[in-house]
Structures are given as C-alpha cells and as structure tokens.
Amino acid sequence: KLESYRRKGYPIYGCNVEGARWEQDREYGSAIFERAGIATIPMQKFKKYDDAIALVLANKNKRYVSKPVGDGDKALSYCSKDWRDMVFMLNKWKKSNAYDGEFVLQEFHKGCEMAVGGWFGLGGFSKHILENWEFKKLMSGDHGPATGEQGTVMRYTQKSLLAEKVLLPLEGFLHGIGYSGYIDVNCIIDDKGNPWPLEFTTRPGWPLFQIQQALHLGCPVGWMLDSLNGKDTLKVKDGIACGIVVSQPDYPYNNVKKKENTGYPIFDLTMEDATSNIHLSEVKMGFGPGKDGRNTEPCIVTAGSYVMTVSGVGKTVHDAKCDAYDTYKKKVCMINSPMVRDDIGEKLEEMLPLLQKNGYCKDVKYK
C-alpha cells in the first residue's frame, strides 16, 4: 500500500516491495549477494519436509541450519549438531504441521557472527556505519529457544572492513530499486577472515532500532528527510551501546490469551525513564495499587509478553553492558516473572580478538 503513496511523491523513508523480497525470500537475497560479487553459503529452498529430510540423509557429513522463508516463526530456526537432530526436528515439524510455508536449509559454517548495516538514501549510505552483534537465544549462555534477538551490542563507525566487503558493494543495486531506509547484513566470519552473508534485514530490526536510539542525536525526522533528499545529516554518539530485552511468560511463544499477561504494573517507571534508556514495547496505561489498596493509581502496565528493551552506553562493551544492567536493576520493577538474559555482551570478550586478528573492528574494546 505504501508504494502507491511513494509514486504520488510522499516522502517515505523505509523499505519498498523489492527490498522486502531481499529479506523474505532468502534464496532470492542470496542471488543478490552473488550478483554483487559477494560469496554466499550454499542453501536450498523447500516446501516439503520429506524433500529436506532426503537432502540431509544424502549429506550426513554436513551440518545444516533451517530457517523459515518470509514471516515464519523464528522459533522454527534451528542449528543442527549433526544429521540426526536435523532429521528429528524436520520430522517433528512435519508431524505437528508447525509451519506450512517455505523454508531453507543452509550449510553450517563455523565462525564469529557479526552484522553491519547503514542508513541509505538518495546520496547513498550515511558515513556512519553500524556494526552489531546479536544474542539470539532466550537464556544466558545461548541456551533455550531462538527468539530472533534477545539483546544486542552495537557501535557506529566511519571505517568498517565488514561494510567494505558485504554492504557497500550493494550500493548500486539499492539505487537501482529505489531503496531508502536502514539495511543490515548478518554474516559469519570464518577463521581466515572471510565474511559469509547469512541474510538481509531490510528494515530497522527489533530491538536493534530501539537500541540505536541510545546512540542517535537530534530529531530523527530531520535526518531521515535529509537522507531522502540526498544529504547525510545523521549525528551519532561515540561509544558502544548495549541493549537487553525484558519479557515475561509465555514469551517467545503465544500459547496464552493476551489477558493472561496484560495488566501487570511496572512500578515507579516514569515517562521520563521511558524516553531515555528504557524503550517500551507491549505496554499500556493502566492502574496499580493506590494507598487505599485498590487498583486506582495510574501507572504503566504490561500489554503482552514482549515488554521493553533497556539500553546502556559506554566506551567499552563492558561499560555499556554494566550501564544497561544497572538501569534495569534500578528502574524496572516487574512482578510477573520477568525474563532477562544476564550475559548480553559477554561473548565478545572471546570473539573480539578472533575478529581483530583478521582486521575487523580493531578499535572496539571489551574492557
């Protein structure tokens, strides 16, 4: 529907239909990388589980990662240990009819996962490039179900080796489709320093966009409109941001009625808090206990299982992580079993030296 407004000349800063296809049709997105001269990991698209099982059985020496195509449930993404658990999961999804859309199997590549993105307009990419590291599992230590993104560490930089290899070569293609807005490429970087793109995100990711606000300066409307008109006026803070997702049961599933996780007060949270380093999601205005014990005191309450993201900023990854968790402990008082990973950022202590030996993010420090 937005495309008709674009054609009428309305200033719309965001993904168009062709850009969305890059993300949602993984096989098509992989072909775009290849056309830009960027090597990709082999993948195959399936509609039938039996066909996917046959591929795995014919290649028992390989590990595979399964991913839904389009808007499929992220919980159906699975990284196998060997052929046996991949076949088991495919049979399980087939039996339960968990997903009736298309999905892909992609060969597993070992390495460090890192993403790079940028804001794109008529004048090309902003000079401020965003490097980021996602934490995708529900529980600390990367255990539990995949949620898409449970927390993220990021920083803006004007010199990114990863961007030079997998993002900037796409500039001509983006101009060709009339793209505007944010675009992100998630990669596996192997021990030789080769980046292997996994997927496009042709929109501000969630909660990535919320965490970005901790680094942005000024009114976003101004620099977004300027980007549409070919000017780069985005201003950002130096330093690193860390964001942590705060959820409640039955996240990441949707097996309970909305009313069962709605209406729980978030005590003492002010609107001032919610416009700085606390980024609200599924909440609304409601009531908590007043002095007389009745629920008559206006306050912010939950309105779903994905409640908020808390961000922090610092000169190092550790500083940003501590800032985010300190804010969570001081400002967030929830009562319905809040779920928060307590290790967002920590894996970078081991990952950064591996990346830096191959020339990536050399000026990023863990401590």
Model-inferred region functions:
Residues 64, 97-98, 296-298, 326-344:
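Short arginine-rich
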Residues 101-105, 175-186, 230-241, 331-345:
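Flexible, glycine/charged-enriched surface loops at secondary-structure junctions
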Residues 310-332:
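Short, well-ordered alpha-helical segments
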Residues 76-212:
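Internal nucleotide-binding/catalytic subdomain
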Residues 1-65, 71-72:
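Conserved N-proximal alpha/beta basic substrate-recognition cap immediately N-terminal to
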Residues 340-367:
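A cross-kingdom feature marking charged/low-complexity
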Residues 151-155, 306-314:
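Short, well-ordered beta-strand elements within core beta-sheets of diverse protein domains
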Residues 163-183, 191, 201-284:
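Active-site "cap" helix and flanking loop/linker of ATP-utilizing ligase/carboxylase catalytic domains
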